[in-house]
Amino acid sequence: MTDYKATLNLPDTQFPMKAGLPQREPQTLQRWNEIGLYSKLRKIGEGRPKFVLHDGPPYANGSIHIGHAVNKILKDIITRSKTLAGFDAPYVPGWDCHGLPIEHKVETTFGKNQPADLTRERCRTYASEQIEGQKADFIRLGVLGDWDNPYKTMDFANEAGEIRALAEMVKQGFVFKGLKPVNWCFDCGSALAEAEVEYQDKKSDAIDVAFPIEDADKLAAAFGLSELSKPTAIVIWTTTPWTIPANQALNVHPEFTYALVDTGERILLLAEELVESCLQRYGLQGQVIATAPGAALELIRFRHPFYERFSPVYLAEYVELGAGTGIVHSSPAYGEDDFRTCKAYGMSNDDILSPVQSNGVYTPDLPFFGGQFIWKANPAIVEKLAEVGALLKHQPIQHSYMHCWRHKTPLIYRATAQWFVGMDTQPKQGGTLRERALAAIEQTQFVPAWGQARLHSMIAGRPDWCISRQRNWGVPIPFFLHKATGELHPRTVELMEEVAKRVEQEGIEAWFKLDAAELLGAEAADYDKINDTLDVWFDSGTTHWHVLRGSHGLGHTTGPRADLYLEGSDQHRGWFHSSLLTGSAIDGHAPYKALLTHGFVVDENGRKMSKSLGNVVAPQEVNDSLGADIMRLWVASTDYSGEMAVSKVILQRSADAYRRIRNTARFMLANLNGFDPAKDLLQPEQMLDLDRWAVDAALRLQEEIIEAYADYRFWNVYSKVHNFCVQELGGFYLDIIKDRQYTTAADSVARRSCQSALLHISEALVRWIAPILAFTAEEIWQFLPGERNESVMLNTWYAGLERLPEGFELDRAYWDRVMEVKAAVNKELENLRTAKAIGASLQAEVTLFCDDAKQADLAKLGDELRFALITSAAQTAPLADAPADAVVTEVEGLKLKILKSAHAKCGRCWHFRADVGSHAAHPELCGRCVSNIEGEGEVRKHA
């Protein structure tokens, strides 16, 4: 028996079947570094339209987690796809470096009593170390960026830029000093930003407290009574007993109806709607003796339960009837609404009682409770209220309460003198900051769209922004305050520029070590130099000012706008929010044109990642076990607009999908063996119909893929590429071409046509996957035939795909119909295989009983119909001639009859043909194979 293997064009490639990504990816990273890929991208980007994705800086503390990986991979997919779309899309990574978590880490290591300058020095060193670790992990993910020149909020230039941004806001009149309740953490010893507050369940003491009447005659008159017949008290309900010592007012809603309720021993004042529930809570019987609107109670005085002072009634529309008594006890130092209401009634800052110190301990001079920590004082306060007969009910409750995101300890609102950016302050020119920011939101694209309403509601309802902190490790607020008046120095903006110049050279230490006389001269004696630092959200929120404005060549000289900010959904109240406020204040618009939000990562059961649950997926472990490309594929395949589920099982599914794409690429590379595009590439009109269809299908798909990338629908890109590999290619085209590819003459039109199509599809495919499978695309690129540059990323979307001409007979609809018929044939072949009536599909001879239209349709392929169906013989016949045992298919107008071929099997092409053995010199071959190895070779037109 002759071995005809040498006469076949068998597939051959050095492209490995086994990906070995954990070992191979680091080699690719090294190669990118050696060829200076990022620099080359910037070079070829010169003159292109610019697309700027501004990096929201991660905090320089701890190892990266799966959420960081998702964020950076999404950004990399975008910048890579924009590069392929013909943009100059730089990516400058950044880090957020100041703030309490780093300072806390340093204090934990070195103690709290070290000198402030040494603390700052150690914070800077610690942040630098953390950045290096995170940087290595981000690079390992395949993220292309300017890693040698990232921006860091602690860089001297950025610290100076932040001071200049603040100066702009001062100049426009947005910054003021005020006494206001702010989120306060005792452990931090500082105010917290809204984004640093999280909510957890907390057990609290809910108490109902009676405040006895002082202005009895006025109260009787308000209710239309001549007098009050019994002792009378107004009742409040609160879950913060520790605020009772600071009570200064009682708030009622002007439009609610209030009732005097006779309970036997005394009369209680309650909201009429809540009388029944309150009496039930107190275990009392009672009768309503009079009612009055809340507005009638204004300024009537009651007595504090245990201090010798009065609490007047103020009208406040924030009072609700959802719980309690309909009356709110007001401690203006410890509540935003309380503070606003008391200020509206003319209470001065000096009149506001603030007995809680920064560490949560009452001042020593507070009667009964001085020197006690507020949470520990709660039982003593409850006991005191009971002692004086003011406690109507005490009941522990579990409720959601604000906590410090770092220490996980409860927070309070605490009125302190702080620096604020005013939301409704009228600036020197233009609208208020709230008006500007709300208008800017309307001009911003949101992906997904619901982000717009979310950010709008946050801006519409937010209070003034407290930008000052009482910490060491932060950018200073370089203000001088007049000792007598408390006013800012009249040359503040000018002085801030002088400070910025020094900070540019020496860092923030330049301010802290500054002798005021150096800038103020003789005036220094009249001014205090303040040592407050800026909220870290002001740090990151002003990066558009110094990063986009030119320090990294990302923007314009004035009013820069990034094309895109991309972060997790929590950043609507974080970086998106602070950047919007600073951009609107300084430039009158948002610093971004579009905001893209991704969801949080959860496990396959929708639970948050937690070490205690054992469901944490660490990106470092995925890199080492499966490879970064698998993680990148998981990210791309997941709809990021909601929660993103990940687990080992889910990642294994991504690995399976990856294998399908890789194997498809490998098959095409193997069949491009010996193909030189410079001399072997055919023009479209020279190619077979099926090959032209495949190229046209790739072009149509490419158009959809480009659109999906532009719309940030990466899961659509993944599904389209995967389906193309599985269905159009793997399930149809690549199966059909094997016979022609392997058996026709090496240089025949039939084979070169097929190889031309494979090259076009491979050139397109490698670009489609490059933004997602960054490492694998680069690997494929190195194995593609023909002259090419060093990296797939140094190119744009493939322009060599050709559309089928208008009016082409075997158009895309035609091949769709052939696919439908082939699927029906395959289904019956599988049934016969299961019944062991047949082996390989080439053992089959199929008769297609068709209606007239379908018979005429399939007849266009002539004898090549058998190649399209991958059977040894295929013929059509009228539907009316179908025997009773013909198989009815799901295709309208088509029945099938499949028989096992009685002919001999060709030893070369494995077709079962009647002419096997008809050639004496090659008794094992069919006539077609003899022609292909000795004669002129077969001619194919269609398939």
UniProtKB/Swiss-Prot annotation:
Motif ('KMSKS' region): 608-612
Co-factor binding details: Binds 1 zinc ion per subunit.
Motif ('HIGH' region): 58-68
Annotated positions binding ATP: 611
GO biological process: isoleucyl-tRNA aminoacylation
Residues where Zn(2+) binds: 906, 909, 926, 929
E.C. numbers: 6.1.1.5
Keywords linked to the UniProt accession: Aminoacyl-tRNA synthetase, ATP-binding, Cytoplasm, Ligase, Metal-binding, Nucleotide-binding, Protein biosynthesis, Zinc
Record-listed L-isoleucyl-5'-AMP binding positions: 567
Function: Catalyzes the attachment of isoleucine to tRNA(Ile). As IleRS can inadvertently accommodate and process structurally similar amino acids such as valine, to avoid such errors it has two additional distinct tRNA(Ile)-dependent editing activities. One activity is designated as 'pretransfer' editing and involves the hydrolysis of activated Val-AMP. The other activity is designated 'posttransfer' editing and involves deacylation of mischarged Val-tRNA(Ile).
Subunit: Monomer.
Stored NCBIfam families: ileS
Name assigned to this protein: Isoleucine--tRNA ligase
Record lineage: Bacteria, Pseudomonadati, Pseudomonadota, Gammaproteobacteria, Pseudomonadales
